[in-house]
Amino acid sequence: MRYNEKELQALSRQPAEMAAELGMRGPKKGSVAKRRLVKLVVNFLFYFRPDEAEPLGALLLERCRVAQEEPGGFSISFVEDLSRKYHFECCSQEQCQDWMEALQRASYEYMRQSLIFYRNEIRKMTGKDPLEQFGISEEARFQLNSLPKDGRTTCIGSQLNVLD
């Protein structure tokens, strides 16, 4: 995917849903964990040097997996290349759990699946389609049959490193 660098930098300045200094290690073999300011903004995970305002890079959180690593750590790997894995070290297991949950909720796919679930629950309770009033109830992206075959909701990301 191609992104406008200025737009990404502007997005990185928006209020973060979560932000913290974490240890971060990239996917290259032999890479060492470095302290990075990590900010979750919508479905992008930006990372910065702690003393700089411009991001070093960003990860687009679509079609990726978040996994628990050693205690107090987690990783993000991408479906199209599972060997490309970013490792993060938190101050506590609680902080690690908070980050993992927030990252899993950040993807468009997770939000879409949640919308479909609640749409069907409302339809069962009221007998009415809540999206009908907006004229979008027949769009494919809002249909249950457009969900992945395995029904998994843990797949959340794709990568983006354009701000180097």
Swiss-Prot record:
Domain named PH: residues: 15-108
Coiled-coil spans in chain: none
Superkingdom of the source species: Eukaryota
SMART domains noted in UniProt: PH
Cysteines engaged in disulfide bonds, as pairs: none
Pfam short name (any one): PH
CDD domains, per database record: PH_PLEKHJ1
InterPro entries: Boi1/Boi2-like (IPR045188), PH-like_dom_sf (IPR011993), PH_domain (IPR001849)
Name listed for the protein in its UniProt record: Pleckstrin homology domain-containing family J member 1
Organism of origin: Mus musculus (Mouse)
Gene: Plekhj1
